[in-house]
């Protein structure tokens, strides 16, 4: 039996709001199970609400319920996975142009797995590019971080897959996104935190769009990371020529001027992407500027 619970929260002002309904499962022995990917205080309170609404004798959490067993998905399967997500906010070009970098990252580079997404020594990946979640969700599904059938629920009521990723709902997601210009500053903070904790093995990757450089927060983070020599940090910039402020000398020159190691690559070439991300950048942060076009993104899908 499934129990749907609406919980009303009241605040000091006397204002009450209705929290979105959650679905629970109740077994024959009366146990109420809330299928969650990450436990939180909200989950606990909702389970208690479910217990009050049915004759439950026990409450338990089933964590990582959205996760699936390791899969045999390949890069060739990504277009089909992306096509399962439908709606007016698909941002198809952004998804296709982001797909190659995301795939290489998760296929060859990061030290992170669905079995240990919260390991203290894991590599971290932050998606800052606001129009890239569909490709991100597809790659996470292909790599076992979430069940492929969840892609069919994208952007629907109660789906964990929103227009922007939510780190409280999806295993392996390090950053709740949506607002441009936040990814690089957050990644700088993560890299600095790892240094303070004397954790020097984990790497921090952040994917941003060139249009995000219209946000001043990125320039501040860029300057600080260069001065602090945060060599655990790698920034991938997808350059599709949409930055309204313009880059007459190239994005890489801006990073280079702040003390970063930089490299320019073809954002649809998997070998170039892998080589750049594995580049030895000694005691400096690394900026990988990946040029992408509508044609290269379209060809990348058609050729694989």
Curated annotation (Swiss-Prot):
What are the GO MF terms of this UniProt record? 3 iron, 4 sulfur cluster binding; magnesium ion binding
Report the transmembrane regions from the record. none
* SUPFAM superfamilies the record matches: 4Fe-4S ferredoxins, Thiamin diphosphate-binding fold (THDP-binding)
- Note on cofactor: Binds 1 [3Fe-4S] cluster.
> Which Pfam family is an annotated match for this chain, by its short name?
Fer4_13
Q: Where is this region: Transketolase-like?
A: 66-304
Q: Fetch the InterPro entries from UniProt.
A: 4Fe4S_Fe-S-bd, THDP-binding, Transketolase_N
The induction comment states: During the interaction with host plants.
Domain of life according to the entry = Bacteria
Which key words tag this protein in UniProt?
3Fe-4S, Electron transport, Iron, Iron-sulfur, Metal-binding, Plasmid, Transport
What does the sequence similarity comment in the record state about its family?
Answer: In the C-terminal section; belongs to the transketolase family.
* Protein name listed in UniProt: Ferredoxin fas2
* Name of the gene this protein is made from: fas2
């Amino acid at each position: 039996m499934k129990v749907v619970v609406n919980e009303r929260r009241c605040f000091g002002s006397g204002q009450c709001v209705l929290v979105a309904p959650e679905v629970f499962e109740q077994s024959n022995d009366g146990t109420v199970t809330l299928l969650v990917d990450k436990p939180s205080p909200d989950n606990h309170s909702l389970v208690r609400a479910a217990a009050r609404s049915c004759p439950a004798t026990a409450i338990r959490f089933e964590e990582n319920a959205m996760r699936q067993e390791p899969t045999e998905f390949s890069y060739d399967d990504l277009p089909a996975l992306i096509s399962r997500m439908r709606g007016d906010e698909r941002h198809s070009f952004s998804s296709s142009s982001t797909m190659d970098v995301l795939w290489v990252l998760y296929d060859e580079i990061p030290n992170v797995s669905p079995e240990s997404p919260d390991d203290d020594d894991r590599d971290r990946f932050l998606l800052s590019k606001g129009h890239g979640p569909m490709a991100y969700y597809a790659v996470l599904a292909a790599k076992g971080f979430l069940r492929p059938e969840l892609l069919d629920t994208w952007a629907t009521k109660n789906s964990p897959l929103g227009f922007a990723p939510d780190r409280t709902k999806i295993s392996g997601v390090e950053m709740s996104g949506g607002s441009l210009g936040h990814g690089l500053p957050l990644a700088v903070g993560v890299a600095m935190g790892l240094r303070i904790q004397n954790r020097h093995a984990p790497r921090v990757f952040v994917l941003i769009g060139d249009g995000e450089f219209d946000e001043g927060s990125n320039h501040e983070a860029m300057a600080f990371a260069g001065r602090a020599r945060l060599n655990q940090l790698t920034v991938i910039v997808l350059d599709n020529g949409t930055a309204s402020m313009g880059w007459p000398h190239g994005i890489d020159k801006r990073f280079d001027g702040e003390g970063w190691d930089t490299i320019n690559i073809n954002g649809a070439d998997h070998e170039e992407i892998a080589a750049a991300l594995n580049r030895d950048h000694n005691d400096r942060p690394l900026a990988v500027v990946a040029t992408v076009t509508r044609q290269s993104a379209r060809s990348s899908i058609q050729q694989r």
